[in-house]
Structures are given as structure tokens and as C-alpha cells.
A protein has these predicted regions:
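Non-catalytic, conserved peripheral segments adjacent to functional cores
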Residues: 1-54, 78, 87, 92-94
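Residue-level detector of short, conserved catalytic/binding motifs and their immediate flanks
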Residues: 26, 63, 81
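Conserved metal-binding segment of the jelly-roll/cupin
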Residues: 56-72
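Ligand-binding loop in jelly-roll beta-barrel domains
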Residues: 68-84
């Protein structure tokens, strides 16, 4: 468990990368009740631009990325936003792709 700070971004935003965690899920619980943007794509060998989706959270709901889900780091809409992160790290395997 640790704290992640999602930075306020300038819009329009260009997303040039996605990441995934092939061996574990990852949960983000917002601490600041600020809206944030979630960008995801289904598990696959490589993310498909046609499958990318984005959602706006009202800041009162958390997000759980299942194992292998492609995602962009959370995007704060108004101000920098803190999240409690629950995940698992593997020392003998590459945990982020």
C-alpha cells in the first residue's frame, strides 16, 4: 500500500503510452474527493487504439485495474489528487509492461 499523487494536466491531453501489470491488479482509492479521468484498454499483447476508453470519476469512487488491463496513470481534472494505492510487487518478474 502506498500514496500516489495524480497531477493536474493541461487539456487537450495527448496520451502517448499505456502500461499494464501482468501479474497483479491495482486499486486506487481517492482521498481528496476531486474528479479524475481514467483511461483504459482491455488486456492484450499490445494496446489497440480502437479499444481505448476514458471515464470521469466523481472523486468519490475508486478504481480497480484487473491484472493485464492497459491504463494511463490517473489524471486529475482540477487539482493534484492523492490516492491510496493497493497493489502487489513481484521481485522476480517484470511487474510493469
Amino acid at each position: 500500500m502506498h500514496i500516489f499523487v495524480a497531477k493536474k494536466r493541461q487539456f487537450p491531453l495527448q496520451i502517448k503510452m499505456l502500461e499494464k501489470h501482468p501479474f497483479f491488479s491495482q486499486t486506487f482509492i481517492p482521498k481528496d474527493n476531486q474528479p479524475f479521468l481514467v483511461v483504459v484498454a482491455p488486456p492484450s499483447d499490445e494496446p489497440n487504439i480502437e479499444d481505448i476508453r476514458s471515464f470521469i470519476s466523481n472523486g468519490e469512487q475508486g478504481v480497480n485495474y484487473s491484472r493485464g488491463v492497459w491504463h494511463f496513470p490517473l489524471i486529475s481534472v482540477n487539482d493534484d489528487t492523492q490516492f491510496i494505492v493497493i497493489d502487489r510487487k513481484y521481485e522476480d518478474r517484470k511487474s510493469v509492461v
